[in-house]
Structure formats: structure tokens, C-alpha cells
């Protein structure tokens, strides 16, 4: 083999190596750019499809890795729930934290705002009827036409007993009253800002349990009023 052939082989090897390295760089760069979709995470977070079994697996993985389960769920929501393996989510969380830190931190913050302050379910039992229950479904941004065409910015909790003023409504968290009183679309409502920044909005009340004032501090479990259909 003469020198010319050796040089051609070296050139070919260099080109192949360069092509492999370039493809690896492109794949890695693409992964960095697409490792976390804030828009998808926000949409999926609002859907909040989380089972008790998945939560338990996430908590176990997070404890093992020295992370918070919220860090894993932020990526889970960014994948629109398509990835459920906690180990894989832990790896993707590292990418998101490194290459999309602001978007990732915002979703983690939303999770903290909701999860960290929750103390109870907002609807209590009916003293006069132990079988009276409630149900709810994902109604976020469903079409509404009262007051004009719009999307529904809430989740309605429906009573099995269609009677105003028998289901007690409680604050799900500690917080400060930010809004209270009559609203055309929401009827009698009260809005509570929790310590972590979440805004919990209780609308369509039949009546208040007492006279609340803006700026007033409430505790989780505070009786705020009764379920109704005002507004």
C-alpha cells in the first residue's frame, strides 16, 4: 500500500469520524432544545391526570434520587403523561434543569403552589343525608355561553342531591381572602390566595358561612359557605 492509499484511507476515516461526531452533536443539541415543553407541561398540568399508584412510584424514585416528586412530575406533564417510568423521568429532569431551567422551574413552582398547601377536599358531608355525595370531571375551558361565548375557567363539582345550601364548602388551604362577594358569572364567590401563591376560587355559593373581608386570613378547613347555583 503506497502513501497515496494511506492518505486516502486516513481522509476517509477522518470524514467518517467527523460525520459520527456531527450527528451525535446534532442529536444532543436537538434533545437539549426539545427536552422540556413548557406549553405541553402547562396544558397537562391543568388536566392533572395523576393516579395514586403513579404518585407512589414517583415518591419512591424521588426519595431514592434525593429529588422531589414534583421535579419528576414536571417532566411527566411536559411529556403529556406519555412517559411514566420514574427512572427515565429522573434522567429527563436533569436535562430540563440544565437546558430549560426557567420553564422547568416555573412548572415545578406551579406544582408546589397547588400541592404544598392542600389540606382537604373543598366539599364536606351533608349532616342530614349521609348518602349525599359529589362528582366532578375535567371541565376546564369547556364551552360556555352565559354572558357570551367563552371557555370555562374552572372545574364544577356536582351534587348528587340537587338542593341548595346543604353541602358545606371549606377552604382547601390556609390563605388570604383576595376576592369576595357577588360576580355575574360566578355568583356568590370567594377567592383565597394560598401561602405558595395558588389562587383557589370557590364560586356559585348559595350563601356564606359568615361575612368575609378582603385581606382576612383563613385556615385550611375554614367553613366558607354552602354549595349553590348562583351566577
Identify the residue ranges that each predicted region occupies.
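Short histidine-centered loop motifs in beta-beta connectors
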Residues: 162, 170, 180, 196-221
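Extracytoplasmic/periplasmic, Sec-exported soluble proteins
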Residues: 50, 64-65, 99, 149, ...
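A residue-level detector for short acidic-glycine micro-motifs
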Residues: 138, 159, 179, 204-207, ...
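Conserved, short, structured surface segments that act as functional micro-motifs
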Residues: 191-193, 214-231
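Structural recognition of the beta-strand scaffold that forms the well-ordered cores
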Residues: 156, 168-171, 191-193, 200-204, ...
Amino acid at each position: 500500500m503506497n502513501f497515496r492509499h494511506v492518505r486516502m484511507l486516513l481522509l476517509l476515516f477522518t470524514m467518517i469520524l467527523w460525520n459520527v461526531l456531527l450527528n451525535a452533536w446534532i442529536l444532543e443539541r436537538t434533545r437539549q432544545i426539545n427536552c422540556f415543553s413548557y406549553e405541553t407541561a402547562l396544558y397537562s398540568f391543568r388536566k392533572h391526570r395523576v393516579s395514586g399508584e403513579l404518585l407512589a412510584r414517583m415518591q419512591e424514585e424521588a426519595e431514592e434520587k434525593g429529588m422531589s416528586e414534583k421535579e419528576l412530575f414536571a417532566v411527566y406533564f411536559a411529556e403529556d403523561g406519555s412517559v411514566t417510568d420514574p427512572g427515565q423521568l429522573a434522567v429527563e429532569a436533569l436535562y430540563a434543569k440544565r437546558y430549560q431551567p426557567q420553564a422547568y422551574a416555573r412548572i415545578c413552582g406551579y406544582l408546589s403552589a397547588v400541592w404544598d398547601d392542600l389540606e382537604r377536599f373543598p366539599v364536606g358531608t351533608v349532616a342530614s343525608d349521609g348518602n349525599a355525595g359529589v362528582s366532578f370531571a375535567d371541565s376546564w375551558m369547556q364551552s360556555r355561553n352565559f354572558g357570551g361565548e367563552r371557555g370555562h375557567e374552572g372545574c364544577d363539582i356536582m351534587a348528587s342531591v340537587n338542593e341548595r345550601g346543604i353541602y358545606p364548602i371549606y377552604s382547601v388551604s390556609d390563605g388570604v381572602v383576595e376576592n369576595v362577594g357577588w360576580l355575574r358569572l360566578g355568583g356568590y364567590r370567594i377567592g383565597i390566595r394560598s401561602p405558595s401563591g395558588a389562587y383557589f376560587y370557590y364560586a356559585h355559593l348559595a350563601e356564606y358561612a359568615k361575612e368575609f373581608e378582603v385581606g382576612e386570613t383563613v385556615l385550611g378547613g375554614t367553613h366558607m359557605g354552602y354549595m349553590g347555583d348562583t351566577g
